[in-house]
Amino acid sequence: MSRELIRTADAWNKVKIARDPNRPNAKFYINEIFDEFIELHGDRNFGDDKAIIGGIALLNNLSFTVIGICKGENTKENIKRNFGMPHPEGYRKALRLMKQAEKFKRPVICFVDTPGAFCGIGAEERGQGQAIAQNLVELMGLKVPVISIVIGEGGSGGALALAVADKVFMLEHSIYSVLSPEGFASILWKDSSRAEEAASVMKITAQDLKSFNIIDKIIKEPRGGAHKNPIKMAQNIKKTILEALGEMKGTDLDTLLNERYNKYRNIENNL
């Protein structure tokens, strides 16, 4: 088998693992990693989007604001959580919690797992684009440490709205891209059946993105994927979070914000 075919197969296999219905979701990781978690609801404007969960958590007697884009564990829950595709009120809820974290000086931990923001007409009417854009602006200047972890799919602006952070991590078999391989193949090649080929061309794997310095670290998964040993995966994430916080401890606010800003300004130089 040629090297290019191997790369194509590897990328598509990671897409399939990232989308595996048994893969642990944000809710699982929050409950497993943190000692306590109190969920907060609503955007104080329209409603409570179940695709995004968030609240206040304790870990080693330290307080955090934790936000996650969450898929369901079965069909009924997936319908409830809109298959992990947030509405604008979900992003506004997330922003409300981020600003609350800033007020009380709590670090923010985000878990990302979405094929993309919901693109229905209702979401557009309620300002989906504006909600995502506002999150990008506010996260860039948020005056507390921010850590974001892509645990499955990281699709487009819907993922980026929770992934402007001081430290961005990806699980070993997660993916992060501007759109799905199927969408890429449909738009560029007018043939969605070439999705497997697109997955390789798009450079969407954690390994690709680390090579471009778009992410900071790859978190190793158990053999076969996170769903093969969810507890071990949660332990690996917990260890990585604590290490990252230790690295940022003592960093003054101006330095933190400047490094975050430069991190994103410099991405184009690495491509």
Swiss-Prot record:
Q: Which GO terms describe its molecular function?
A: acetyl-CoA carboxylase activity; ATP binding; carboxyl- or carbamoyltransferase activity
Question: Which Pfam family, any one, appears in the UniProt record?
Answer: ACCA
Instruction: Establish whether keyword tRNA processing is in the entry.
Output: no
Which EC class is this protein assigned? transferase
Q: What is its EC number?
A: 2.1.3.15
Keyword list, A-Z: ATP-binding, Cytoplasm, Fatty acid biosynthesis, Fatty acid metabolism, Lipid biosynthesis, Lipid metabolism, Nucleotide-binding, Transferase
The record's Gene Ontology biological-process terms are:
fatty acid biosynthetic process; malonyl-CoA biosynthetic process
Taking every annotated instance into account, which residue ranges of this chain make up the domain CoA carboxyltransferase C-terminal? Answer: 1-247
Q: Which reaction does it catalyse?
A: N(6)-carboxybiotinyl-L-lysyl-[protein] + acetyl-CoA = N(6)-biotinyl-L-lysyl-[protein] + malonyl-CoA
Q: Report the locations given in the UniProt record.
A: Cytoplasm
Q: Would you tell me the Gene Ontology cellular component terms? A: acetyl-CoA carboxylase complex
In the UniProt record, does the keyword Signal occur? Answer: no
Q: What pathway does the UniProt record associate with this protein?
A: Lipid metabolism; malonyl-CoA biosynthesis; malonyl-CoA from acetyl-CoA: step 1/1
InterPro entries tied to this protein:
Acetyl_CoA_COase_a_su (IPR001095), ClpP/crotonase-like_dom_sf (IPR029045), COA_CT_C (IPR011763)
Summary of subunit composition and partner proteins: Acetyl-CoA carboxylase is a heterohexamer composed of biotin carboxyl carrier protein (AccB), biotin carboxylase (AccC) and two subunits each of ACCase subunit alpha (AccA) and ACCase subunit beta (AccD).
Its family?
A: Belongs to the AccA family.
The record's function comment reads:
Component of the acetyl coenzyme A carboxylase (ACC) complex. First, biotin carboxylase catalyzes the carboxylation of biotin on its carrier protein (BCCP) and then the CO(2) group is transferred by the carboxyltransferase to acetyl-CoA to form malonyl-CoA.
Q: Which NCBIfam families match?
A: accA, AccA_sub, PRK05724.1
Q: What is this protein called?
A: Acetyl-coenzyme A carboxylase carboxyl transferase subunit alpha
Q: Which organism is it from?
A: Clostridium perfringens (strain ATCC 13124 / DSM 756 / JCM 1290 / NCIMB 6125 / NCTC 8237 / Type A)
Q: Which gene encodes it?
A: accA
